[in-house]
From Swiss-Prot:
PROSITE patterns: CYTF (PS51010)
Described function: Component of the cytochrome b6-f complex, which mediates electron transfer between photosystem II (PSII) and photosystem I (PSI), cyclic electron flow around PSI, and state transitions.
Membrane topology: Single-pass membrane protein
Cofactor-binding details, from the entry: Binds 1 heme group covalently.
This protein's encoding gene: petA
GO molecular function, one term: iron ion binding
Family of the protein in this entry: Belongs to the cytochrome f family.
Signal peptide: 1-35
Chief place of localization: plastid
Annotated positions binding heme: 36, 56, 59-60
GO cellular component assignments: chloroplast thylakoid membrane
Protein name: Cytochrome f
Length: 320
């Protein structure tokens, strides 16, 4: 009886330990996945600087294209698509954090006019939902619903990202007006070269921090190198650490200069930004335009009928 109780107690403890481990794993994974995409959120109140530069360019140093497509005009309280395209060669592989090669990821930030925001799920049509796929968008800040971010997500599947946007209604929001508004977008493909704290990632070139002779190159067990440079002037030893990923360009005994590249530049990605314009159209103005066009068409029809009637009268008088 005692043995059976001990077995039950051990079984209960093992089950509890497994459950706790799973919970910790899930929570950790969730926090990492939620925090990782938006490095800029931690350091910048607004992703667009006063100069117009989007802050993602501070970490993604290479310049690459990005494209945005929106309707020319939208009516109030209407859901529309903002399509962001982040083109790149799908055959390319990037250096991952562990130094291995892998597929590129993409990300985007969409800066909408005040009042525009992500459409609620119950307002999104099945057609737009199909284009969205499994993407999950979030606001840059809880109080900045007009700034949306996404990523990183697999580039091979989401090089074209469809944002479902809800336009504001000036009838309910008095600070919104029927005007032409700018929309800004930034999009990156691949990992960045600089982390928010200013340190380098392994997806960039590493330069010599001193001039002299490469006296020793030590290949580290987990990848990467320790390069010892002997300063020719005072014999001082300087050690440069190269993480796994970049390919080494120098060899032992080689004379190098300060800031000379020690590695290749493995970066194949980059960041780009663009803009578009959209008009929040007054429905009454549209109705007025339609009424005007209808009036013009009717006037043309009456003129044609009147002309034909006049021609008939003239013809009858000539016959008489």
């Amino acid at each position: 009886m005692q043995t059976r109780n001990n077995f039950s107690w051990i079984k209960e403890q093992i089950t509890r330990s497994i459950s706790v481990s799973l919970m910790i794993y899930i929570i950790t994974r969730a926090s990492i996945s939620n925090a990782y995409p938006i490095f800029a959120q931690k350091g910048y109140e607004n992703p667009r600087e006063a100069t117009g530069r989007i802050v993602c360019a501070n970490c993604h140093l290479a310049n690459k294209p990005v494209d945005i497509e929106v309707p020319q005009t939208v009516l109030p309280d209407t859901v529309f698509e903002a399509v962001v395209r982040i083109p790149y060669d799908m055959q390319l592989k990037q250096v991952l954090a562990n130094g291995k090669k892998g597929a590129l990821n993409v990300g985007a930030v969409l800066i909408l006019p005040e009042g525009f925001e992500l459409a609620p799920p119950d307002r999104i049509s099945p057609e737009i939902k199909e284009k969205m796929g499994n993407l999950s968008f979030q606001s840059y800040r809880p109080n900045q619903k007009n700034i949306l971010v996404i990523g990183p997500v697999p580039g091979q599947k989401y090089s074209e990202i469809t944002f479902p946007i809800l336009s504001p209604d000036p009838a309910t929001k008095k600070d919104i007006h029927f005007l032409k508004y700018p929309i800004y977008v930034g999009g990156n493909r691949g990992r960045g070269q600089i982390y928010p704290d200013g340190s380098k990632s392994n997806n960039t070139v590493y330069n010599a921090t001193a001039s002299g002779i490469v006296s020793k190159i030590l290949r580290k067990e987990k990848g990467g190198y320790e390069i010892t440079i002997a300063d020719a002037s005072d014999g001082r030893q300087v050690v440069d650490i190269i993480p796994p990923g970049p390919e080494l360009l120098v060899s032992e005994g080689e004379s190098i200069k300060f800031e000379q590249p020690l590695t290749s530049n493995p970066n194949v990605g980059g960041f780009g930004q663009g803009d578009a314009e959209i008009v929040l159209q007054d429905p009454l103005r549209v109705q007025g335009l339609l009424f005007f066009l209808a009036s013009v068409i009717l006037a043309q029809i009456f003129l044609v009928l009147k002309k034909k009637q006049f021609e008939k009268v003239q013809l009858s008088e000539m016959n008489f």
